[in-house]
UniProtKB/Swiss-Prot annotation:
Keyword Transcription attached: no
Name this protein carries in UniProt: tRNA (guanine(27)-N(2))-dimethyltransferase
Region called Disordered, residue ranges: 1-78
Catalytic activity: guanosine(27) in tRNA(Tyr) + 2 S-adenosyl-L-methionine = N(2)-dimethylguanosine(27) in tRNA(Tyr) + 2 S-adenosyl-L-homocysteine + 2 H(+)
Length: 733
């Protein structure tokens, strides 16, 4: 009998019932047998006395038919459980249906209509909640069912206590029939979930996969519409879950806009040297980067967008047609695509889309410009990138494995980059030098050297752009610039280790600080190997600034200007671009930009051919004029070295004080409160103390502090250094 009662409570399903259709529920089954259901016409014609109570409906006829979600087509009606409602009033109406006026979208418990004016809960069996007055029932529905519901797209999935059949199959694949307690019914896949937290995670997984309607129940459902995003006058279609790389094939990150604009300016500056350029976006995803190249640079570039995923390749082709760019596979298809071009439609350019492994493609073809932006580290693709890159070509590498580069996962950095790293105050520049060192080693293995044009390390990525110099001599010169760094753990002073193969007896003498003599134990560690040379090319950065002004990229102009100040190691107030006799001076937005006349196609030989000795010599002279004296490596954080009990000066004033003291100084993009200078740490803290004011004076004038003797200043600096060292030592040990 218990099994029979459970069977009576199981939901009964009927197919193809209209939304507005009115039904009279069939009588409950008895223990003797279950009669066949009468046809709809018989049910409609059956008289119902007004005085007699309505017959009891079938127990737990739960999953009645209802229209599917608004996003589904009308012909694909999906079944919705009665526990899924839009408003609390809809849930209350289930319990107050009288005299055969039953909504086809609802199904009632057999105890809904009891003697008198008592009603039973439509979502609870009689054993759990007996029939009661209307005000009690409303309070029960609101407190027990509605308040603990899960909301999704305007619907509320309320908690259900009916003994419904589990829809989710077991491990073998069969559906288990077992008695269930409180549970939820999923509006998307009709699965039964017991806990609310599990239901939230279940719905969230549906959203991550882009499943926003009942695709499991509906016979025919349309795919979720693709969203169209616009960046730099380029439209791209993206999937609903485009921001989650683990859940989508076409990952698109809006936070990488600065990265895309920097690479575009790099390519635009290179296009002024020689045309046309063979460009490769090795990991296309949505193809946004290659589309911007082809749309704004036109015939100056020949763009190839590659991706290994078939869905991404299809999406790239759709985005090409969306931006009126023709997809070229071979010459025949190019001719056909030109014939298909509609009247009045303008062909902005051609893009070659390939579905191939990036390593295989870079081995098969040679390029002038290669951009690598894999998901994670890029060390697996560096050897292939330098294998066929043309002479004086450019390779840009975007690394998003910031957990290892920023010393959060040190063992991963040792595994991928073969370097030792710890968390320091200059960890972002340390990450950039680690990536450049890996790029330099990969180029040297292919008998090529590199010249670093710029390196940027921001919150989400590390971008390194290098120019390739062919020849074993350039490779040897590049390899010599990879050195180890000695870092003091007490005061965070640092210096690159001297060249030589001989083992030094006391490497602590290379550090400017005397922490090893005043502190117990070993005070310094060896980091690296790292890139020890310059990270910026001033001449190339100025050309990038001109391209950003020319194309109206306002977002990165401030960043490029900061890079120029950093490469010259000069304060912003002293920034100026001097024009020479062979330089065209242009003014745009109040900034003077120079463009050289000798950077034309005459200075470069055709694709893949080597230069003559005379042209290589001229190029070397040009590079020497572009690059000024190398900037000092690394920087100091002014907050980290502030004096206890003193109000430090403003950063802009402090830069002037360091410059007046005879040191090179500039701000850095790696740290908003960082100061790049060639001053030792002791001098840095001495000047910082000299122009700081005591906190208890309430804004004491600087002249009083400057009148202190040099001996007193030195003593206080040493005391502050020792205090900082002891504090940092306590944290480390």
């Amino acid at each position: 009998m218990e099994n029979m009662a459970e069977e009576e409570l199981l939901p009964l399903e009927k197919e193809e019932v209209e939304v507005a259709q009115v039904q009279v529920p069939t009588p409950a089954r008895d223990s003797a047998g279950v009669p066949a259901p009468a046809p709809d016409s018989a049910l409609d014609s059956a008289p119902t006395p007004a005085s007699a109570p309505a017959p009891a409906p079938a127990l737990a006829q739960a999953p009645a038919l209802s229209p599917s979600l608004a996003s589904a087509p009308e012909e694909a009606k999906s079944k919705r459980h009665i526990s899924i409602q839009r408003q609390l009033a809809d849930l209350e109406n289930l319990a107050f249906v009288t005299d055969g006026n039953f909504d086809s979208a609802s199904s009632l418990n057999s105890d809904n209509l009891d003697a008198g004016n008592r009603q039973a809960c439509p979502l609870c069996p009689k054993e759990k909640f007996r029939a009661c007055n209307s005000h009690k029932l409303r309070r029960h529905l609101q407190n027990l069912h509605w308040k603990v519901s899960v909301e999704f797209e305007g619907y509320r999935m309320c908690i259900c206590h009916l003994p419904c059949r589990p829809v989710k199959p077991n491990i073998i694949g069969e559906q288990i029939t077992s008695k269930m307690g409180a549970h939820y019914h999923c509006i998307i896949c009709s699965a039964t979930i017991t806990r609310r937290t599990d239901m939230l995670g279940h719905v969230r997984r549906h959203m991550n996969k882009g499943e926003t309607k009942s695709s499991y129940i509906a016979a025919s459902t349309a795919k979720p519409p693709k969203e169209i995003l616009k960046e730099a006058d380029t439209d791209v279609q993206v999937c609903p879950n485009y921001s989650i790389p683990q859940k989508t094939d076409s990952y698109f990150n809006p936070k990488m806009k600065l990265n895309r604009q920097l690479i575009f300016c790099t390519l635009a500056a290179l296009a002024e040297e020689r045309k046309p350029l063979e460009c490769l976006d090795a990991f296309g995803a949505t193809g946004i980067m290659g589309l911007q190249w082809a749309k704004h640079l036109g015939n100056a570039v020949k763009v190839t967008i590659n991706d290994l995923n078939e869905n991404s390749v299809t999406l790239i082709q759709e985005n090409c047609h969306l931006n009126k760019l023709k997809v070229v596979v071979d010459s025949k298809e190019k001719e056909k695509s030109d014939d298909i071009l509609e009247e009045g439609e303008k062909n902005l350019g051609n893009i070659k889309v390939t579905k191939m492994d990036a390593n295989v493609l870079m081995h098969l073809r040679s390029f002038d410009f290669i951009h690598l932006d894999p998901f994670g580290t890029s060390v697996n693709y560096l050897d292939s990138a330098f294998r066929n890159i043309r002479n004086l070509g450019i390779v840009s590498v975007t690394s998003t494995d910031i957990s290892s580069l920023y010393a959060k996962a040190q063992h991963v950095a040792r595994r991928h980059y073969g370097c030792n790293i710890v968390r320091t105050e200059y960890y972002k520049e340390l990450a950039a030098r680690i990536v450049v060192a890996a790029v330099a080693r990969a180029a040297a293995r292919c008998n090529k050297g590199i010249e670093v044009l710029f390196a940027v390390a921001l919150e989400h990525f590390v971008l390194v752009v290098v120019r390739v110099l062919r020849g074993p001599t350039s490779a040897d010169e590049t390899a010599k610039k990879i050195q180890y760094l000695i870092h003091c753990q007490w005061c965070e002073e640092r210096i690159f280790q001297k060249d030589g193969n001989m083992v030094e007896e006391n490497p602590y003498r290379q550090l400017p600080c005397n922490c090893h003599g005043s502190m117990p134990g070993k005070t310094a560690i060896e980091l690296g190997p790292l890139w020890s040379s310059s990270l910026f090319n001033t001449g190339f950065l100025k050309r990038m600034l001109f391209e950003s002004l020319h194309h109206g990229l306002d977002d990165i102009q401030t960043l490029i200007k900061t890079l120029i100040f950093e490469s010259e190691c000069t304060p912003q107030s002293q920034f100026s671009i001097h024009a020479s006799s062979n330089v065209n001076k242009q003014e745009e937005n109040g900034v003077f930009i120079k463009t050289t006349d000798d950077t034309t196609t005459d200075n470069y030989i055709a694709q893949g051919k080597r230069k003559s000795n005379e042209m290589i010599t001229n190029l070397g002279k040009k590079q020497k004029t572009d690059v000024s004296t190398e900037h000092p490596p690394f920087y100091y954080n002014i907050h980290r070295h502030s004096i206890k009990g003193m109000n430090m000066p403003k950063l802009k004033k402090f830069l002037c004080y360091l410059s007046q003291a005879g040191f090179r100084v500039s701000r850095t993009h790696f740290d908003p409160m960082g100061v790049r200078t060639d001053a030792p740490l002791m001098q840095f803290k001495s000047i910082l103390l000299k122009y700081s004011t005591p906190t208890y004076t309430g804004g004491q004038s600087e002249s009083h502090v400057q009148s202190a003797s040099e001996d007193t200043v030195t003593e206080r600096v040493e005391m502050s250094v020792n205090d900082k060292a002891e504090a940092s030592g306590c944290r480390r040990w």
